Amino acid sequence: MKVYNTLTRTKEEFVPLEEGKVKMYVCGPTVYNYIHIGNARPFIIFDTLRRYLEYRGYDVTYVQNFTDVDDKIINRSHEEGISPEEVAAKYIKEYFVDCDGLGIKRATVHPQVTDNIQQIIEFIKELEDKGYAYAVNGDVYFDTNKFEGYGKLSGQKQEDLEAGARIEVNDQKRHPMDFVLWKAKKEGEPGWDSPWGEGRPGWHIECSVMSKRYLGETIDIHAGGQDLTFPHHENEIAQSEARSGKTFSKYWMHNGYININDEKMSKSKGNFFTVRDISKLYDLEIVRFFMLSAHYRNPVNFSDEMLNQAKAGLERLYNTKEKLEFTLSNLVESPLTEKEVELVKELDDFRQKFIDAMDDDVNTADAVSVIFELAKLINSNVDENSSLEFAKKCLDEFNELTGVLNIVNKKKDTVLDKDIEELIQKRTDAKKNKEFQLADDIRQQLLDMGIVLEDTRQGVKWKRI
């Protein structure tokens, strides 16, 4: 398996630090609002990577944090008239609601910053003792000039970063790129006792500390959105490696941006959508399928047109599975035919093609294409004359590959509304009585209700559209 490592800017063979085990950290949300569609992409992508690694037999420890103390949370608490703790608790709960809709598994650990304050203070103290941090008026900063490798993740030299960055003027800093590790408490803000006075952690230190606490000083994969490469992940490397003297993460993986209708998403442009907004218009499995239909490092354009294309594609896969299950339920035990023996070999080829795609830098786009090829084979070769064994093998293969991506696994509603059931029966009776115009009218009525009928030898089949 190869993955693209942002640190080396090359595809590298994936070799975990410990055979059979993977330690993985993915930056989680700052919990002050519902997550937006840009947040959803890394959460879906790296959930899929985790699932694939587990499919290949790895024992994955997957850590994703919650930033539950932050300026945005404090501001939201003032707006809503509740405490920062209540804001964080509310949006952590809502985050999991969205994750369930998107098919995202719970992490092995979901640490929160406020549960790790003492560990953060100890980490900063070590940096200060080693000369990498300095305190000014209750704030503590990381001295970027002291860390020789600063800029290696983003591929820039310190002087280039300083020249190109939009830097807030701060007379307390020794150097423009120095970043805060500990913030002195301001009135109306939460704070904790520390050697530098009451205060709270800076953003960057949090992930370094929680990664160390739950995964150790060196991990296999650190991942997140491309926007986190600099400064967040760059700063994580600096403070972690300055403290330990060891490589922080062997592989760094970042997904590309999301544009909305060909424009960068932003609140000022009014094209900012939360996952909760989208869920009112589309099943969130469609969003997951949409994200997986593109390579994770490529930018993607999010629009109604693209979502409707994803919906149609996902519906085709559901129809394949539904038809296969329906056919299977009507077959009796019978051996494989000569043709089916050859087709079973093709089924194995599909599994290998799928693995080859995922092994090539988690190419979910190609993996999805393989699943469509498999669906085509199933649709062309499974019918009422198929052997039970062949149909079972097809379903097992289909479920295995879609299961890795966690798509096409929802149970469709098997209970028809009474009105729909009555209409289908009326149409059946009309056909028996040769009232073909009435039968056609009922078919159209059902179509208007989102129900498509298919007359087969086994009887009338239906599906929702």
From Swiss-Prot:
Short motif ('HIGH' region): ranges: 29-39
Q: Which residues make up the binding site for ATP?
A: 267
Tagged with keyword Transferase: no
Q: Which keywords describe this protein according to UniProt?
A: Aminoacyl-tRNA synthetase, ATP-binding, Cytoplasm, Ligase, Metal-binding, Nucleotide-binding, Protein biosynthesis, Zinc
The record lists its disulfide bonds as: none
Give EC number(s), comma-separated.
6.1.1.16
Any transmembrane segments, and where?
none
Annotated Zn(2+) binding sites: 27, 207, 232, 236
Q: Catalysed reaction(s)?
A: tRNA(Cys) + L-cysteine + ATP = L-cysteinyl-tRNA(Cys) + AMP + diphosphate
| SUPFAM superfamilies listed in its UniProt record | Anticodon-binding domain of a subclass of class I aminoacyl-tRNA synthetases, Nucleotidylyl transferase
Q: Which GO terms describe its molecular function?
A: ATP binding; cysteine-tRNA ligase activity; zinc ion binding
Xref: InterPro entries: Cys-tRNA-ligase (IPR015803), Cys-tRNA-synt_Ia_DALR (IPR015273), Cys-tRNA/MSH_ligase (IPR024909), CysS_C (IPR056411), Rossmann-like_a/b/a_fold (IPR014729), tRNA-synt_1_cat_dom (IPR032678), tRNAsynth_Ia_anticodon-bd (IPR009080)
Q: How is the cofactor bound?
A: Binds 1 zinc ion per subunit.
Report the cofactors.
Zn(2+)
Q: Which family does it belong to?
A: Belongs to the class-I aminoacyl-tRNA synthetase family.
Give the quaternary structure. Monomer.
The protein, known as: Cysteine--tRNA ligase
Annotated source species: Clostridioides difficile (strain 630) (Peptoclostridium difficile)
